[in-house]
Amino acid sequence: GFDHRGETVWPRLSSCSGAIDMFLLKKDAFWHNKALWTREPMIHLLPHWNHPGHEGEIIKVWAYTNCDSAELFVDGVSRGKVELQPHDHAAWEVEYHPGKIEVVGYKDGRECCRDAHETTNAPVKLMLRCETPDVKAGDSAVFTCYTLDSEGREVPTADPTVRFVVNKLGVISGTGSAVYDHEPVKSNIRRMYAGQISAAVKCTGKGILALYAYADGFEAARVYVDVK
C-alpha cells in the first residue's frame, strides 16, 4: 500500500507503513513485496553504497529476490552465495569501503538477474523524468527529479533545494520528498530527500508541456511532454 497522512507522531507528517511513499516513490518494501508475489526473476540490493565517514565499519547488505540463490560481489570479488527458502531474503555483512557492490540472482543454477550500487562522486546535475504515460489535457502528470554525478551516476544521498518552473501549459499542483518536510504541498521549492523529489503538474491544455528544475551549484534540468 501507500503511505498516507496521519497515524504518526510529530514531526512526521505521514504513516510510513506503505511500500510506496506519499510521493509515489518506491521504497525497499516495494521490492520485498514484488519478490514475494511475482514470478518474473528479480532482485533488489540494499542499501546504497555512499557512506562517507563509515570506512572500515561493518554494514549489513540485503537482497530481496524470488530466485533460488543469490551471490554478492564486492569490487568483483565474491562474498558468498546464499541458498534461499521461499519468502526469505539474502544477507551478508560487509566492511564498508568506497567501491561497488553487486548481487546476482540464480534459478536452477543459471544467472537470471542482477542489481548493483556504486559509490558516487558529489552530485553536479539535476535530471527530470515523467512517470505518467499518455498525458492528456486535464490530467495531472507526475515527475521525478534526481541528480547525477560527473560520471552520470545517480546519487542516492543528494539533498539540494530545488525550484520547479512550468510553462503556460501547466500548473504545479504539488511537490514532495521527506515525511518531515513541513513546506506547503503546493510549494514549487522543496529540499530533495534520499536523492529524489516528486512534482505533480496539472496539464491545462494541449501542446508541449515544459518543466524545469533549478538548484544552486547544479546544472539545471528540463523535460518536455506532448500533452494530447
What are these regions (language model features)?
Residues 76-85, 173-189:
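Solvent-exposed serine/threonine-rich low-complexity stretches and specific carbohydrate-binding patches
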Residues 1-138, 150-154:
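Substrate-binding clefts and catalytic carboxylate motifs of secreted carbohydrate-active enzymes
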Residues 98-102, 142, 208-210:
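Short, conserved beta-strand segments of beta-strand-rich sandwich/propeller modules, principally
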Residues 114-121, 218-228:
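Short beta-strand elements
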